[in-house]
Structure formats: C-alpha cells, structure tokens
C-alpha cells in the first residue's frame, strides 16, 4: 500500500484545488506544525470536548517532523480541525504497535484487544504509518459534504506531501458515522489514495 508516484507539484496543486473550493464559501485552512497551548485552548473553545491522548502534548512527544494539525477557519474563527502523526514502526507489525500504544492510552479491563479486532492482512502491515484523528467540526459548520471532503482531502494531501514514505494512513471513526456513510465521505475506504485503508 504505497502512495502513487506524485510529484510535490501535483500534490500542492491538489491541495490548492481543495483550498480554493473552501475559499469560495469563506473558509481558510492552515497547516500548524505543533499544538500550542493557545491553539489547544482555541480548539476546546470551539466546542471540541477534549484532545485525544495520541495528539495531546501532555501525553505524547511531538516535533515538527512527526506531527501537525490542519485547521479550518470561517471569518477568522476556528471551526474545524484534524491532526496527523507519523510513526515509523519499522518491522514491528501494525497490530503489535496498536496493541502496545493504545493499551496504554485507552486501558480496558475486559473485551477484545485492538489487535484482535483487526483483519489479519492489516495486523501484519509495517513501515511508516500515519494516524489521523481529532477531526472536529463546529456544529454550525457540519452537513456540507463538499466542504468536509475538500478539508479532509487537503489534509490527506498535506500528509503525503510531508511524509512521502507513508505506507498506510489510518483513523478510528465512530460506528454511527460509518453507518451513515460519513467515513467514505471523509475519504477513508474510498480508494482515493492507495495509502488509505481500502
């Protein structure tokens, strides 16, 4: 599952198309290298109830090289976010990685493990993987499918522009969103990129 051979120019053109479409409705996007206390405060003030452990600067270490946020603003006000982080797991199997990381961040006393819930083909994936999460849209800015698609696809473009070695991009989505078809709208499972789980 490798990213097709796209040049940085082609990726930047793709991102520009998405950003231009958003601008037609008064939205701007920005790639922010690190979650600062000011940005975290702004995200929480926009209505997001919490920052997940995987993207919390209190629980995880970040550099300009291993993570970033993409923000969505309308008339200067933050109304949406998504975050991305790369983990270079090398030869460690994806299932083992998830088990190790998520058992610390989301401890459960019973129930199936994260690894046990993975299809066998994914459990053995290794290399450079990107986790995207903390996607949030203010309630007043939900429901516009074209806006959502453009924002998330611009974030995908930013991921692949920054980390062209990525072998897989994954996210956890709510079951209700999956049933409503939103996961495909976001671009996951859509076949948009070979690096996205299909």
Model-derived features with residue positions:
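Acyl-donor binding region in acyl/amide transferases
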Residues: 95-193
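Sequence termini and other peripheral, non-core segments
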Residues: 1-38
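Generic preference for hydrophobic/aromatic residues in regular secondary structure cores
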Residues: 24-34, 169, 188-189, 193-194
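Polar low-complexity intrinsically disordered regions
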Residues: 1, 75-77, 139
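A conserved beta-strand-loop-helix scaffold within acyl/acetyltransferase catalytic domains
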Residues: 23-128, 133-135
């Amino acid at each position: 599952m490798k990213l097709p051979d796209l040049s940085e120019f082609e990726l930047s053109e793709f991102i520009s198309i998405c950003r231009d479409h958003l601008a037609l409705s008064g939205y701007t996007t920005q790639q922010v290298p690190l979650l600062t206390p000011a940005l975290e405060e702004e995200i929480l003030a926009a209505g997001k109830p919490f920052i997940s452990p995987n993207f919390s600067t209190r629980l995880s270490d970040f550099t300009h090289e291993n993570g970033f946020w993409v923000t969505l603003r309308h008339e200067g006000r933050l109304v949406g976010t998504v975050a991305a982080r790369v983990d270079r797991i090398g030869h460690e199997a994806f299932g083992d990685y998830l088990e190790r990381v998520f058992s610390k961040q989301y401890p459960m006393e019973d129930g199936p493990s994260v690894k046990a819930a993975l299809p066998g083909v994914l459990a053995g994936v290794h290399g450079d993987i990107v986790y995207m999460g903390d996607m949030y849209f203010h309630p007043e800015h939900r429901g516009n499918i074209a806006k959502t698609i453009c924002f998330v696809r611009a974030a995908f473009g930013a991921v692949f522009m920054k980390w062209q070695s990525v072998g897989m991009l994954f996210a956890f989505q709510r079951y209700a969103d999956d049933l409503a078809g939103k996961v495909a709208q976001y671009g996951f499972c859509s076949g948009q990129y070979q690096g996205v789980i299909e």
